[in-house]
Curated annotation (Swiss-Prot):
Catalytic machinery residues: D92 (proton acceptor)
GO cellular component, one term: plasma membrane
Catalyses which reaction(s): CDP-2,3-bis-O-(phytanyl)-sn-glycerol + 1D-myo-inositol 3-phosphate = saturated 1-archaetidyl-1D-myo-inositol 3-phosphate + CMP + H(+)
Protein's pathway: Lipid metabolism; phospholipid metabolism
Main EC class the enzyme belongs to: transferase
Lineage, uppermost ranks: Archaea, Thermoproteota, Thermoprotei, Desulfurococcales, Desulfurococcaceae
BP-aspect Gene Ontology terms: phospholipid biosynthetic process
Transmembrane residue ranges: 32-51, 58-78, 103-123, 150-170, 172-192
Protein name: Archaetidylinositol phosphate synthase
């Protein structure tokens, strides 16, 4: 189990119930948090251009936080639903696309952004496909959504001060995302051959 998966387990067991208890008093509807996540991600684009890169980073961090709490609120309030699951997965892809658009606005080369985004869209597809075939795919590969999100935040933060370093990190992230695609494809194909 990777470091991020251990952190996720700790979050889900220790932090999420407390956060969910608090947030459920603000709104017990977890879909509110799900819907707010891409709104914050979309606001990050003009924020980078017209307010400040730091404001944009804060909006992306807020978007990621909202995405992390929607499921916790759903479980805490007993409002887990197929609709919520569908909205979460679908809107995550929209948010991911908006994070990558912010990378482009920050000056990351378009081909690097395309490589990161396309691989980043294939990774969750492979998980969904594998799980529809009865396989447990979560935790397989180097760059799951959490790792990709942290990488994007780091690349954006570094791009404010040193674009060349940010480009190098974005290139490395793109390679790691595609390694994750290959890891998942190999795992799923291997399991299906059994």
């Amino acid at each position: 189990m990777g470091v991020f998966n251990r952190l996720r387990s700790f979050y889900e067991a220790r932090i999420a119930p407390t956060v969910a208890s608090f947030l459920s008093r603000i709104s017990p509807d977890p879909n509110i948090y799900t819907l707010a996540s891409p709104v914050a991600a979309a606001a990050a684009l003009p924020a980078w251009l017209y307010i400040s890169p730091v404001a944009s980073l804060l909006l992306i961090a807020l978007s990621l936080l909202l995405d992390a709490v929607d499921g916790a609120v759903a479980r805490f309030t007993g409002r887990v639903s197929p609709l919520g699951s569908f909205l979460d997965s679908s809107l995550d892809r929209i948010s991911d696309s908006l994070y990558h658009a912010t990378l482009y606005i920050a000056g990351v080369h378009p081909l690097i952004v395309i490589a990161m985004l396309s691989g980043g869209l294939i990774v969750p597809y492979l998980r969904a496909k594998g799980e529809s075939l009865g396989l447990e795919v979560r935790g397989r590969g180097l760059m799951e959504r959490g790792e990709r999100s942290i990488a994007i935040l780091a690349i954006l933060a570094i791009s404010i001060y040193n674009l060349q370093t940010a480009l190098a990190l974005a290139s490395a992230a793109a390679v790691l995302v595609w390694i994750t695609v290959i890891q998942r494809m190999v795992y799923i194909a291997g399991e299906l051959r059994r």
